Amino acid sequence: MERAGPGSARPQQQWDQDSVEAWLDDHWDFTFSYFVRKGTREMVNAWFAERVHTIPVCKEGIKGHTESCSCPLQPSPRAESSVPGTPTRKISASEFDRPLRPIVIKDSEGTVSFLSDSDKKEQMPLTSPRFDNDEGDQCSRLLELVKDISSHLDVTALCHKIFLHIHGLISADRYSLFLVCEDSSNDKFLISRLFDVAEGSTLEEASNNCIRLEWNKGIVGHVAAFGEPLNIKDAYEDPRFNAEVDQITGYKTQSILCMPIKNHREEVVGVAQAINKKSGNGGTFTEKDEKDFAAYLAFCGIVLHNAQLYETSLLENKRNQVLLDLASLIFEEQQSLEVILKKIAATIISFMQVQKCTIFIVDEDCSDSFSSVFHMECEELEKSSDTLTRERDANRINYMYAQYVKNTMEPLNIPDVSKDKRFPWTNENMGNINQQCIRSLLCTPIKNGKKNKVIGVCQLVNKMEETTGKVKAFNRNDEQFLEAFVIFCGLGIQNTQMYEAVERAMAKQMVTLEVLSYHASAAEEETRELQSLAAAVVPSAQTLKITDFSFSDFELSDLETALCTIRMFTDLNLVQNFQMKHEVLCKWILSVKKNYRKNVAYHNWRHAFNTAQCMFAALKAGKIQKRLTDLEILALLIAALSHDLDHRGVNNSYIQRSEHPLAQLYCHSIMEHHHFDQCLMILNSPGNQILSGLSIEEYKTTLKIIKQAILATDLALYIKRRGEFFELIMKNQFNLEDPHQKELFLAMLMTACDLSAITKPWPIQQRIAELVATEFFDQGDRERKELNIEPADLMNREKKNKIPSMQVGFIDAICLQLYEALTHVSEDCFPLLDGCRKNRQKWQALAEQQEKTLINGESSQTKRN
């Protein structure tokens, strides 16, 4: 370093710290010699301490990340050694040695079935009751009755016999048995199981007549509603008596003894009625008659309870058979979600007798909406189509109830939608509902195995009466059965989605193999050359001018761009903080460079390098580095270099329209997802693992930021999110301490760096614009040739004269407000805004000149004509 002598007229040179550091970076031999000669033990210890990377005891360092793109880290198997969800053993193997009937049997036609033929069971014949008046034989009659009850489950036959036993005690003229039932609206009523049982009457005669009585109406209805017996001497004097039955049958009712039949929970399950006492006490029933009647009716309660258990078990058997058939159906078809849901909907419609079945699939990426809707009506059951049509008239499907059920995670049963006050309808909406003929509705959430997440909703409309075809309300049984149905429906959906995920993974593998066939890791010779050159000297950032927003790479070789990248990692303290080996860093940089296609005019390695350089300048010269964490800086630089990996020179729209395999992998940001996958592939490749010094948590965090940053370069996402960022800036509410706002800022910063070519000095901007136009015109040519479509003006080679005006429009619509907002965050980023404004003036002048030329040309042509 030269100094001015005492007598020299030349002033002493003033150097700031950055200039000294840059000079030391450029003169590595002197720096090394000075450190060896002047370095103290404290300096050496501090040097080591600066490079020691502390890893938490509970976290395990990553030496080689070989995880797939979709799942970067897998938890240790020992971490989940005890799974809470593991079912406990509830039956031992020895219990299967008991002589139970076969699970699967064949019926008379040889068809395999889960149900046994209950009609073929051998039953002991019912014995006729003995009507001895000897009280000593009453005990034997009771024992005989108990024996019959224990061996038979026919409610009608047993109750008929009980009434014949009762007749021997109380001697009434007629007996009737009414059972409590519920309709589809859960309203109770009474139906006669035995009517007018008399001495000498047969079972067939007593059970043929079926009468329905309303709840809490008449003598029987009153006893059923209040659960208290009635002993009426003269029926016609009681206002509760209904004489319509007498008028129909021509029978004269005098005295009535009516008693409730209760189960073990003291619930009324039936009502027994004795009519017209034959002898004694003036034709009225005595207290002894009441006691005897009540005693025998206790047996009726037992019979009804046992029979209900038996009927319930038969019903459950039949339900289980349907569910087993549904399970078999689900596992037969797992390839197509449309096919499996068509079969499920057809099963539900036919079994539950409903008009319409709609299955809504929740969007995994946006839980507030549905990704797919599958609708089927009973008229479609006879159609032979193998798939459900997704595209339907939106007016045919109502989303409001499904959205409500998805949010509440509880079933919804509406007997009449027009009368339900939870969903206010306007007159216009009511007309729409009437047009759709919606009356009763049952809607149930479809949950995953953990019961804490809704993956879909099943909606049934209009329960139909089998006999009359009229619409009725869904009852509790329908709710329970649909809840069981949707469990299997959820299994089918999840299995099919897993199958589709496997298919997507296979498509991803095909794309990866295609990429790997084109690309390869950096050659060892090239890596050694860069490593040797970097070990000798890497010029300072000032010398390389990579902290300038006006930086241009046109004069640099590819090897020099790699050296600049090493300097960026070094000056951002990433090499030191994360213990990156120079050999690994060199190979990773060259591998990234190699994975950019050379036949792409603009979106190649040079564009990625310029994006990273702008990011470096924003962090350093723009003073943003001190406002971010080391992991965020690391992720941003990696994302900037990798954000267009394996770009094919075409946009997302072309990928979709050409039906490229990449379009099968992602529903949005197709190329950006692919760029991230390529980034992970390189990071996980042997010799390229620059993140191996991170802990597991740091690795996860870094990958998350990298993915968010790369996806942020999709202009469609930028346009969707920028309004929130601009509003925060405008209202002075922007706060980098808020995690969401910080994520939003990093996304905006990535876009600003990606578009930074628009801020370069005019000669550089013109050259880059020519490269962009070349790439766009190549895509337009391919659209004409391969897709037979007329390209947009931006891609149309024949509209080249519109480039200046399109550039002005692009700056106004996309760029200008972004750089204004970025300048509000950091005033040191003003050169980006200033460059953008100056280039807009240049493009505006060219556009006006182009327009004048066009007008003059048209005028000259008119004069000639």
UniProtKB/Swiss-Prot annotation:
Phosphorylation is regulated by binding of cGMP to the two allosteric sites. Phosphorylation by PRKG1 leads to its activation. It catalyses: 3',5'-cyclic GMP + H2O = GMP + H(+). Coiled coil: none annotated. The keyword Lipoprotein does not apply. Residues 154-304, 336-493 form the GAF domain. Its cofactor is Zn(2+); Mg(2+). One of its GO terms (molecular function) is cyclic-nucleotide phosphodiesterase activity. Zn(2+) binds at residues 607, 643-644, 754. PROSITE patterns: PDEASE_I_1, PDEASE_I_2. Gene3D superfamilies: 3'5'-cyclic nucleotide phosphodiesterase, catalytic domain, 3.30.450.40. The active site is at 603 (proton donor). It comes from the Eukaryota. Keywords: Allosteric enzyme, cGMP, cGMP-binding, Hydrolase, Magnesium, Metal-binding, Nucleotide-binding, Phosphoprotein, Repeat, Zinc. Pfam families: GAF, PDEase_I. Binds 1 Zn(2+) ion per subunit. Binds 2 divalent metal cations per subunit: site 1 preferentially binds zinc, while site 2 has a preference for magnesium. Tightly binds zinc. Binds 1 Mg(2+) ions per subunit. Binds 2 divalent metal cations per subunit: site 1 preferentially binds zinc, while site 2 has a preference for magnesium. Binds magnesium less tightly than zinc. Changing residue 289 to A: Decreased cGMP-binding; no change in catalytic activity. Most potently inhibited by zaprinast and dipyridamole. Belongs to the cyclic nucleotide phosphodiesterase family. Composed of a C-terminal catalytic domain containing two putative divalent metal sites and an N-terminal regulatory domain which contains two homologous allosteric cGMP-binding regions, A and B. Plays a role in signal transduction by regulating the intracellular concentration of cyclic nucleotides. This phosphodiesterase catalyzes the specific hydrolysis of cGMP to 5'-GMP. Specifically regulates nitric-oxide-generated cGMP. This is cGMP-specific 3',5'-cyclic phosphodiesterase. It comes from Bos taurus. The gene is PDE5A.
